[in-house]
Amino acid sequence: YVTSSSSSQRFNEGSWGPYYNPDNYYAAGYQGINDINAFLEYSVGYKDKLAVKRDTLTLDGKRKYEEDVLQVERFIAEAHALRAYYHFELAKRYGAIPIITEKTKDAAAARKPRQSFDEVAQFIAEETAGVMGGLVSSWTDVSMPTQSGRVTQNVARAIKARALLYAASPLHNPANDPAKWIAAALAYAEIINTNKFSLYKDYRSLFLDGVSAEKEKEIIWAVRFSAGNSMERKNYPIGTAGGNTGVCPTHDLFLAHGHKTV
């Protein structure tokens, strides 16, 4: 049993549609892209902007200026990778989509022709490959473990690899072109060959006690969160405090597993 307003029940009933789509990412995705494009547009000439009305001559002043320049350069590289990520999430849901690389002031300005999934995947591959030099290998490598969750080189590689894998799948590759599978395999090999990843020894503690170099071996892209039990409470049965029966397996999923008649 589940509440009638929950997303899973909407899917079960077939009551979702263009006016209620629990996975409606279109507006949010393009808003994110537009925000990134605005940042990239504003960041042009960032070195000169950072030098305005500040000391860049003394040793200490020059050091602080160079630190700020490095930080902005990282932000720019991360922004390009995130723009690729947003395009992937949109294409994953909607297939052919417009590729937007300039800030738009209104919806009419964003009405561009859709481009095929292959074209989007190629854009993602080029967008991520072009900023690898500006991304850190990991945040612990640069003594900034608290920044875990921001984009790294392997995050960018993973975005590219997944886009190429989807492009090779039967949905977007009905002719089963082997070149697309090879491109996806090579993209994943870039991650594997870094030899940075392995399973962490204690899965439970992976989510506790902060970030460490050892834990990062299992994590390509971390999601930051604050400790709490709201997710578990939402899984409680209806009738308990805060319960929403959040876990709603379908009947087909139930039948796919062994069960015993009581």
Task: Describe the role of every protein-language-model region.
Residues Y1, P98, W139, S148-V151:
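Short, solvent-exposed turn/loop segments enriched in Gly/Ser/Thr/Pro and often Arg
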Residues Y1-S7, M132, R150-V262:
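An aromatic- and glycine-enriched ligand-binding surface/loop that stacks and positions planar moieties
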Residues V2-Y94, A109-R111, Q115-Q122, T128-S143:
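Conserved, well-structured interaction surfaces
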Residues D35, R74-I76, A81, A96, ...:
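Extracellular structured ligand-interaction cores
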Residues A38-L40, H87-K92, P98-I100, F123, ...:
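Structural recognition of the beta-strand scaffold that forms the well-ordered cores
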Residues L70-A77, V142-V155, R204-L206:
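A glycine-rich, coil/turn loop motif that links secondary-structure elements
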Residues E89-R93, P98, W139, Y166-A175:
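Short coil/turn linking the two alpha-helices of tandem helical-hairpin repeats
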Residues K103-A107, A189-E190:
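Short edge-strand/loop segments of extracellular domains
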